[in-house]
């Protein structure tokens, strides 16, 4: 799928996952989700302090969280801005590595598995998925499990809840 995905990676904290692996996972996930057009997204791995600032600024919650997703369409649509390059701008995913590490420990699996779970959750948000109620949440969690199965991590991340 060369040229299909422009993935921008920013690691404010070292990633236990190689850049090529991140790219491979996102390409598989986008294919699994039926995305056919070229697209662009960014992934930032960061600290609790940084994600807390973002959470406070954009969600008015003064606390760290595990993952934030900023969908480009939500940000650009009010201004009538459209991409004229033919590349679908998905947006940005930000993951707190310290929070992911704590969640991985609590769930009894590796950090890399938790990061994949959180990245898949963020990607679904960029593609318009949301979980305003329990049924929507369960559907989204099931889709995440399918995405992890597509990269052979299905049995290793057994989340039942996602905040």
From Swiss-Prot:
Subcellular location(s) of the protein: Cytoplasm
Signal peptide positions on this chain: none
Enzyme class: hydrolase
Essential cofactor(s): Zn(2+)
Superkingdom as given in the UniProt entry: Bacteria
Pfam family, one: YbeY
InterPro entries linked to this entry: MetalPrtase_cat_dom_sf_prd, YbeY, YbeY_CS
E.C. code: 3.1.-.-
GO biological process terms, semicolon-separated: rRNA processing
PROSITE patterns the record matches: UPF0054 (PS01306)
GO cellular component: cytoplasm
UniProtKB keywords: Cytoplasm, Endonuclease, Hydrolase, Metal-binding, Nuclease, Ribosome biogenesis, rRNA processing, Zinc
Cofactor binding note from Swiss-Prot or TrEMBL: Binds 1 zinc ion.
Molecular function (Gene Ontology), one example: zinc ion binding
Binding-site positions, Zn(2+): 121, 125, 131
PANTHER family (alphabetical): ENDORIBONUCLEASE YBEY, CHLOROPLASTIC
Family in the record: Belongs to the endoribonuclease YbeY family.
Function: Single strand-specific metallo-endoribonuclease involved in late-stage 70S ribosome quality control and in maturation of the 3' terminus of the 16S rRNA.
Protein name: Endoribonuclease YbeY
Gene for this chain: ybeY
